[in-house]
Curated annotation (Swiss-Prot):
Its EC number is 4.1.1.19. GO terms for biological process: arginine catabolic process. The record marks S41, S42 as: Cleavage (non-hydrolytic). This is Pyruvoyl-dependent arginine decarboxylase. It comes from the Archaea.
């Protein structure tokens, strides 16, 4: 029997009156604000399938790889990205975040890091996906990108 792990990739960005509220609002925008998130490291099991994020049961405990950035400085460009690479064996995830960097550099760095992780493990990339969000801070802003483990 083959067990398939499902994961969803999501992101969100928002403002709030405080750093915590901005972060919470970004999680809500990403569809993961009403669950308890447990940060895990960066390995996906064999037979992982990437799916759309379903509506999650409020209060449930959900594992995720989470990238986030928060700033209170007006005009800051904040970025959060996750890069996912799968192979026929297993996969890797990296998170990357930044303030006032070119979003393409943040994205490229995430891709480079996940390619390296796969390479040192001797894994051939079958699929590579990047999810990112960028936000220009008005008062207090947050950006989040996540790989959410569903099973």
């Amino acid at each position: 029997m083959v067990i398939v792990m499902k994961v969803a990739i999501t992101s969100g960005a928002a403002e709030g009156p405080t750093k915590l509220n901005a972060f919470d609002n970004a999680l809500l925008q990403a569809g993961i604000g009403d669950v308890n998130l447990i940060k895990v490291s960066s390995i996906l099991p064999r037979n992982t399938r990437i799916v759309e994020l379903p509506e999650l049961e409020p209060g449930s405990i959900v594992n995720c790889v989470l990238s986030h950035m928060v700033s209170e400085r007006r005009g800051d460009l904040i970025s959060a990205a996750v890069a996912v690479a799968t192979s026929s064996d297993f996969g890797c995830v990296v998170e990357n975040s930044s303030v006032n960097r070119d979003p393409e550099d943040v994205r490229s760095e995430a891709i480079s890091m996940v390619r390296y992780m796969m390479s040192v493990r001797g894994l051939e990339i079958k699929e590579l996906i990047v999810e990112e969000t960028n936000h220009v801070v008005e008062k207090c802003g947050a950006a989040v990108s996540a790989v959410v483990y569903l099973d």
